[in-house]
Each structure stands twice: as C-alpha cells, then as structure tokens.
Amino acid sequence: MIKKENLDKTSAWPFVEAKKLLRERKSFIEKKGKITLQTGYGPSGLPHIGTFGEVARTTMMVNALKQLSDFPTEIITFSDDMDGLRKVPDNVPNQELLKENLHKSLTQVPDPFEKFSSFGEHNNEMLKKFLDSFKFNYNFQSSTTLYKSGFFNPTLKIILENYEGIMNIIIPTLGKERQQTYSPFLPICPETGHVLEIPVIEIDKEKSNIIFDNKGKKLETSILDGNCKLQWKVDWAMRWYALDIDFEMYGKDLIESAILSTKIINLLGKKNPSGFAYELFLDEKGEKISKSKGNGITIDQWLEYASPESLSLYMYQNPKRAKKLYKEIVPKAVDEYLDCIEKSKKQNELQLLMNPVWHVHNGNIPEEEMIMTFSMLLNLVETSNADNKDLLWKFVKKYKLDISETNFPIFDALVGYAIKYFNDVIKAQKKYKTPNESEKKALEALVKTLEKCTDEMSPEDIQTLIYSTGKENGYADNLRDWFKLIYEVVFGDENGPRMGFFISFFGVKETTELLMNKLK
C-alpha cells in the first residue's frame, strides 16, 4: 500500500489528472458507484500507434485512480463505426471497391481485406486484437450497435427537444455557406445507404422525426434506431451523456470540439467529463500521423524492434509535448526504458511514483539487471556480424560468464530486437568514413595502443589509454573529434558507445582486428 503522504506529494501526470477527476466528478461518481473513462477510435483506417497511446495513457490514469479511490473503474473504447467513409485510405487493398462505397457508414462498406462483413468490423477487430495483445482492460462499444439497438434513443429524443439550443451553440462557429446546410442529424439514405449531410426543413419532436430536403425531394425519417446519426460534436456530447463518462483525453486538434461538446452536454442537463488534451503524434517530417495515410511507424513495426513496455514508456513521457514517431527513435526509447528500470532499484516510494516504469508496469517493476544499453547491443550486432540470437549470446556470455537466456528474459528479447532493427533500419544508413593520412596515422597509433591492452584491464583503464592516444596524435584540444573519428570509421556513425566498455565487452584482440580491417 502506497503511503498517503506520497500520493499527496507526487506530481506524476496520471496522479495529477486522477486527483483532478475525483475532485471535479466527486458527487457523480459517488452517485453511480463507479468511474467511467472513455477512449475514441475512428475506424476509417487501420489502428495506429496514436490509438495505442490514448488507451495506454488512459490505463495509466486508471492505475493512479486505483491508488486514490476504492471505486471500480471502466475504460470504454468507443468506435465511431457509423461514420460515413469520406475518402479511400492509401494503405488498404481493393481501392476501387472502397471508391464505389464512399459516404456509406463504415459498417456498411465491404471489407477490402475480405475477412469480415464490413470495413468497419475489420478495423474494429484489428483494434481489439492489438489492445488484447497489450493486455489492456477495456469495454468495446460500437456506435452502429448502440444506435441500431435503441440504446441511444432516449438521449436522441433529449437532443431533438433541445434542437434550437444546439443550433445556437454550433451555428456561430460555422462559415456562412455551412450555416445554411448544417444539421446536427444526419439521416441514412434508405435508397443508397449514404450518410447524408443535408439541411433540415422541419422537426417533429412528438414523433421523433425530421424532414429533410434530399435533392428537391422531401424526406421524412425517424431519428431513432439507427435511421440517423449525429454530427461529430453533438455525437460526442451524446456519448458522454448516454454512457455517463467521467473522463476522456483527446488530441489538441479536438480542443475546439471539446469546448462545443461541453456546452451541448451542459445544455442537455449534465456536467461534462473531466478532460485532458494531449499533443499530437507526428512522423519524421513533422506531419500529423494519420490512420488513412499510414505514415510514421506502425504498432507492428515497433513491436518487431522493441518491447510493448518501451512503447508504453514513450507514451507516458510528456503527453503535452508533440511526439515524433518513426523508426529511428526506437533505440533511444528502449534505452530510456532500461535506464528507468535501473534507476528504480535505488529509489524511495515517492521517487518511484515519478519514475515512468512505475506507471508502465503498474508498480510491478522488473528486477532484472540491465547488462548493456540497446544502442551498445546494436553496435555489437554490427561488429560481430551476428545474424542470429545464439551467435550474439556467445559474445555476451564471453563478457558476462554468469548469465543465461532464461535468467535475463528482457535482455534475451533485446538480443532478438537488436538483430532485426540493425538489419531493417541501420544497415542501409551506414556511412563509413575513409580516413585521410593524418587521421589514418592517429588510428594506427590506436591499434598499437590496443595491442598492449589485455582483456583483464578495466573498461576505465582502456578508456584512459584511448584518451591519451588521441591527445598524443593531434586531438589534445578536441577529444570529441577524436571519438567521432573512431565512431565514423568503425561504426559508420557520428555517435557510438563508450569505447572502453565496448572493447572490454567485444574483446581487445577482436577490436584491434576490426580497426585494422577498417584501415586497409
């Protein structure tokens, strides 16, 4: 049990947001006896890493809430699968099939992968599959199911009752042209199945019907049982109302929507949920990651190169700062995860609550000793030419005699990830430097220094000798350039490992031969 004084003191963001939620929603939570958090998913494209981030962060909030409160918690993962398909995603097959079904609800669009009854169902199943793989606890809800089953009917009637008030909230935020055509209700065309964005001529609150102008023809339809869906901002407010949501986080691009949805739920007679706006996920070019574009790194790619926990840690850090998500950030993210595990071993309870791995592992932090960084392991893959785990483990065991794959499961997984990442990402990017005459002379002096070293020497002693060699060969004023030269010649990169440690690990003789081969 965590001490109350430490729970009061911690400034870790999941605890800060959980305390804010309990403050703002106290009476509502006490009345219903549980805390309901929501995450949203638009299944117009495949689930991407940003989708994972929202569920992971909300789960961290739940973990904090469990320390602060005895109320049961629930995460609703809501899929907007009744939305119309507005454009064909770039990263799916059967593009023509999707073109033919534009503007239909996603659960009425055929599955281009030919596995499920609709494109919406396919993407929902992909979402559930990947959330399950991370062992998230969530309650999946489908917009189509809740509309068509009548679950939303009582709230839809309240929205129709407040039609004029809702229009007064939304209309001032629209351009003049859009003001003429806007309607909070989008009927599903009985002939084409399209989600129609057409103006309302008349509403019948008693019958729960609306009359539209459909290309000069009057169309009367019920707003109930899935015959209509709501425009986004009104739909979001309805969801909060009908599902009694206490908390939802959202990207900063939805801040304006959240303000309007808040006004709408307040108009309907309920208090809005507690909210949290996070910064967006960007690709390497700084562009927003999009489900339909498939840009940035995918979840599957990350999991080929690193553990789910390293991804969770990346999501934990600085949620209010924009994050670039692409392949090259993986090693740094993995090393930060390993470093946080190491730090946790010497931390007191309050410090642990501030450590990201406490939130990643919900307090059950692994106790495994971290043998080396992922970056170092990548250098070892390159220099050893190891193309399988067994071969790489041989090098590791030469340095650490008392370790085995079974006793070091995190490191064993890292070995596999390092081989895959090096071959897929790093290999093609390597640019090895050809040293000029003076640089070659300095590196030949380093070879002579290494020939005098032994494997019994400490990494610190070897590092000192490398420093001395650099100073004696023209790098006394800039040792940074000396190490940069070594890295560019040996590793094909401007940065590299601490050389004393690397040589101790890889072997003095092996490193000497490696350097000699590079100088040929």
Where are these regions (language model features)?
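Basic, alpha-helical terminal appendages of large translation-related enzymes
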Residues: 1-34, 47, 74-76, 167, ...
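Charged, often glycine-rich, active-site loop that binds/positions anionic groups
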Residues: 82-99, 155-160, 288, 293
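Catalytic adenosine-cofactor/nucleotide-binding cores of aminoacyl-tRNA synthetases and other
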Residues: 253, 258, 279-416, 491-520
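N-terminal catalytic cores of NTP/NDP-binding nucleotidyl/phosphoryl-transfer enzymes
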Residues: 2-93, 235-257
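A glycine-rich helix N-cap at a beta->alpha junction
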Residues: 96-130, 134
